[in-house]
């Protein structure tokens, strides 16, 4: 069974999805930023778990969510897909890292 917090129909999940949906093109947010925007500070890890469970056809802009150091948390093909999506939106990665001071949606 899934922890209540990360169940896709939980209040937490709906708040997280709304925060992710609010990230405009060309901007990014960290897992912690999303947790704070959703009203659940200190729940960044649960945000990561929820994002990892999104269905393949999700319309949420999952690629705009990064680690707190501005790096992509995904690996392999998924990391490459995320990098390509960010670059299509003119988000600059230098050394695999996005400057959150410049590109963050919520800071």
Residue ranges and their predicted role:
Residues 2-107:
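Nucleic acid-binding interface residues in structured DNA/RNA-binding domains
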């Amino acid at each position: 069974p899934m922890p209540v917090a990360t169940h896709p129909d939980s209040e937490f999940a709906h708040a997280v999805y709304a925060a992710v949906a609010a990230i405009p093109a060309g901007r990014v947010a960290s897992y912690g930023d999303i947790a704070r925007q959703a009203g659940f500070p200190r729940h960044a890890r649960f945000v990561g778990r929820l994002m990892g469970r999104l269905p393949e056809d999700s319309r949420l802009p999952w690629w705009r969510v990064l680690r707190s150091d501005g790096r992509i948390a995904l690996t392999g093909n998924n990391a490459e897909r995320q990098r390509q999506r960010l670059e299509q939106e003119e988000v600059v990665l230098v050394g695999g890292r996005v400057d959150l001071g410049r590109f963050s949606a919520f800071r």
